[in-house]
């Protein structure tokens, strides 16, 4: 089955739309060429002009079948590689944040008497409460001052309790002859845990660094009010029972087309680059090079597969040995069989000084590079995938 392509629609009747399409293709080609690997003696490559020409391709549909499994497997490998790169990047960021958090200078480390029942971690905002000052019974000047994190309460707005750091040289290490501080008596308030009052202050507070105390303090087990069974009802299931999970897919089914392409094109493509001499130093000399492709002859068997599940198109070229023309030209290299003719016009040098035109060796070299790239990148088992 043959397909008729109206190639003239690319240039008529709206030329402005054709110009926009050409500009978008030029921008796409320049973006791809900027990332492509090139030899050290070839400078940056830039596309400056593009024209579709008037001659269109001849397409013949040979077969329609299911998508080859190799396309989906190769696509999954590419997805897994991208996901692994993303996970590695996230892992590096987490390690970096963890290392920065572990960095701590012992010089100037502050010590606080931290309540081991406190659920507040790593806060540095404190409030002084003079109404909770407690004097020892033997006339000692040492006092326990009301200092607590602002975010912690006993269920009462002013129940904040901590121990102030002493600015004197008195040691906080307990000795046998020291008198223990009296237990703190807090008035009865609703919602206050009696266990917090039953322990003396010396048993509820410990002297440790703030960074260590926040991580080492055990958290109190929250009390949960039992819920009556009659007051709640089971939530509906996320997916109805007995039905398979919903699979997102495109409305277009997956299919694969085997096409025979024959294209004697008269398109026009202009590229600018340079020939660089890197001896005795880098970029010791550079010669401007202008290449103009004025036509080519392409004969190939193309496989185009569409994956409706992932909405992607896979494209590759196959070497069909059953083709009679290929049997006669078996001694010809594959690249030359696919691209039998490529017309190139070359200019080397500056236009305002001296220019060498149609240098045969340069043109043959460019043709060989194009054929080799075509075989290495598009001939099966190599293929390109386009995400729509």
From Swiss-Prot:
HAMAP family (UniProt xref): Mdm12
Subunit structure: Component of the ER-mitochondria encounter structure (ERMES) or MDM complex, composed of MMM1, MDM10, MDM12 and MDM34. A MMM1 homodimer associates with one molecule of MDM12 on each side in a pairwise head-to-tail manner, and the SMP-LTD domains of MMM1 and MDM12 generate a continuous hydrophobic tunnel for phospholipid trafficking.
Localization, UniProt: Mitochondrion outer membrane; Endoplasmic reticulum membrane
Principal localisation: mitochondrion
Keyword set includes Membrane: yes
One Gene Ontology cellular component annotation held by this UniProt entry: ERMES complex
Biased composition regions of type Pro residues, renumbered to the chain: 234-243
GO MF, any single term: lipid binding
Homology family: Belongs to the MDM12 family.
Comp. bias intervals (Basic and acidic residues): 83-101
Cross-referenced InterPro entries: Mdm12 (IPR027532), MMM1_dom (IPR019411), SMP_LBD (IPR031468)
GO biological process: one example: mitochondrial genome maintenance
Protein's membrane topology: Peripheral membrane protein
Protein name in UniProt: Mitochondrial distribution and morphology protein 12
Alphabetized PROSITE patterns for the sequence: SMP
Swiss-Prot/TrEMBL keywords: Endoplasmic reticulum, Lipid transport, Lipid-binding, Membrane, Mitochondrion, Mitochondrion outer membrane, Transport
Function in brief: Component of the ERMES/MDM complex, which serves as a molecular tether to connect the endoplasmic reticulum (ER) and mitochondria. Components of this complex are involved in the control of mitochondrial shape and protein biogenesis, and function in nonvesicular lipid trafficking between the ER and mitochondria. MDM12 is required for the interaction of the ER-resident membrane protein MMM1 and the outer mitochondrial membrane-resident beta-barrel protein MDM10.
Region (Disordered): 75-101, 209-249
Domain remarks: The SMP-LTD domain is a barrel-like domain that can bind various types of glycerophospholipids in its interior and mediate their transfer between two adjacent bilayers.
Domain SMP-LTD, first and last residues per copy: 1-388
Pfam family, one: MMM1
Species of origin: Cryptococcus neoformans var. neoformans serotype D (strain JEC21 / ATCC MYA-565)
């Amino acid at each position: 089955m043959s397909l008729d392509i109206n190639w003239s629609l690319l240039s008529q009747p709206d030329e402005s739309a054709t110009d926009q399409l050409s500009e978008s293709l030029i921008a796409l080609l320049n973006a791809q060429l900027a990332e492509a690997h090139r030899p050290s003696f070839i400078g940056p490559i830039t596309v400056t002009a593009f024209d579709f020409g008037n001659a269109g391709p001849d397409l013949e549909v040979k077969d329609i079948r299911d998508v080859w499994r190799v396309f989906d497997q190769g696509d999954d490998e590419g997805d897994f590689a991208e996901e692994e790169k993303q996970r590695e990047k996230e892992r590096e960021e987490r390690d970096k944040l963890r290392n920065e958090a572990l960095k701590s200078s012992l010089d100037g480390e502050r010590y606080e008497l931290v309540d081991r029942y406190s659920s507040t971690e790593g806060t540095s905002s404190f409030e002084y409460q003079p109404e909770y000052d407690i004097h020892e019974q033997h006339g000692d000047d040492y006092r326990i001052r009301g200092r607590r994190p602002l975010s912690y309460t006993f269920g009462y707005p002013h129940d904040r309790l901590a121990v102030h750091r002493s600015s004197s040289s008195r040691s906080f290490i307990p000795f046998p002859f020291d008198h223990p501080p009296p237990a703190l008596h807090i008035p009865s308030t609703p919602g206050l845990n009696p266990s917090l009052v039953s322990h003396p202050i010396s048993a509820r507070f410990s002297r440790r660094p703030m960074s260590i105390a926040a991580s080492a303090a055990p958290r109190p087990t929250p009390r949960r009010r039992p819920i009556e069974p009659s007051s709640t009802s089971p939530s509906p299931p996320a997916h109805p029972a007995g039905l398979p999970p919903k699979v997102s897919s495109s409305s277009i089914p997956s299919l694969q087309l085997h096409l025979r392409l024959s294209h004697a094109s008269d398109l026009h493509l202009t590229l600018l680059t340079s020939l660089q001499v890197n001896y005795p130093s880098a970029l010791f000399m550079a010669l401007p090079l202008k290449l103009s492709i004025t036509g080519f002859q392409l004969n190939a068997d193309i496989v185009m597969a569409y994956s409706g599940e992932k909405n992607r198109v896979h494209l590759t070229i196959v070497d069909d040995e059953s083709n009679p023309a290929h049997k006669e030209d078996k001694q010809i290299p594959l690249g030359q069989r696919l691209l039998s003719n490529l017309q190139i016009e070359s200019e080397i040098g500056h236009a305002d000084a001296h220019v060498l035109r149609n240098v045969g060796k340069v043109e043959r070299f460019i043709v060989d590079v194009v054929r080799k790239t075509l075989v290495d990148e598009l001939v099966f088992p190599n293929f390109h995938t386009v995400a729509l």
